[in-house]
Amino acid sequence: MKRPALILICLLLQACSATTKELGNSLWDSLFGTPGVQLTDDDIQNMPYASQYMQLNGGPQLFVVLAFAEDGQQKWVTQDQATLVTQHGRLVKTLLGGDNLIEVNNLAADPLIKPAQIVDGASWTRTMGWTEYQQVRYATARSVFKWDGTDTVKVGSDETPVRVLDEEVSTDQARWHNRYWIDSEGQIRQSEQYLGADYFPVKTTLIKAAKQ
């Protein structure tokens, strides 16, 4: 089902209580205002829609909302209307101003479909396409997963205990690590992934998950 989050913000600003209107205005300013946003506990508590923080290629932290959820994929929109698409927490496509992740195949076999069931040594192979300095690249990427201890993820004043999942990825030309912070229910609370082969890091921190 498609859910246009930006329209939802507009509806929130037109109706509901003064408190909700103030929240809507605050989030609107965060979405289209200065990067590096940090929402307050009240903002997070009253959040009416799915959202997360993202950091692109070492840039400032952005507040990102879920624009659409369809066919098992979630499409997140940045404050400058760039789009990042995830599936089961994995970045699978981007529409940014510069370089992009073009595609990832074999997603039906991705162990992240059920992260809590991953065992050390689990593996996955796929083809990925991306642009690097505007040049199109394709490679076969091979992943090996292992658990790497425990941690906590903090959003506002709330701390969630998590297990850390390490994904070692290799192609014929490069090797890198993606990492995922996963709670007791199998929800990916935080991640560090790469748009290409050891190129263009993307960090995510979940604020509010989309409804299943």
Curated annotation (Swiss-Prot):
The record's InterPro entries line, in alphabetical order, gives:
GfcB, YmcC_sf
UniProt keyword list: Cell membrane, Lipoprotein, Membrane, Palmitate, Signal
Q: Is Heme given among the entry's keywords?
A: no
- Where does the record place the N-palmitoyl cysteine lipid attachment? C16
Q: Where in the cell is it found?
A: Cell membrane
Q: Where is the lipid attached (S-diacylglycerol cysteine)?
A: C16
Family matches, as SUPFAM superfamilies: YmcC-like
Major location category of this protein:
membrane
So which residues are the signal peptide here?
1-15
A Pfam family the protein falls into: YjbF
GO CC annotation: plasma membrane
**Can you tell which superkingdom this protein's organism belongs to?**
Bacteria
Q: How does it sit in the membrane?
A: Lipid-anchor
User: What family does the entry list?
Assistant: To E.coli YmcC.
Q: What is this protein called?
A: Uncharacterized lipoprotein YjbF
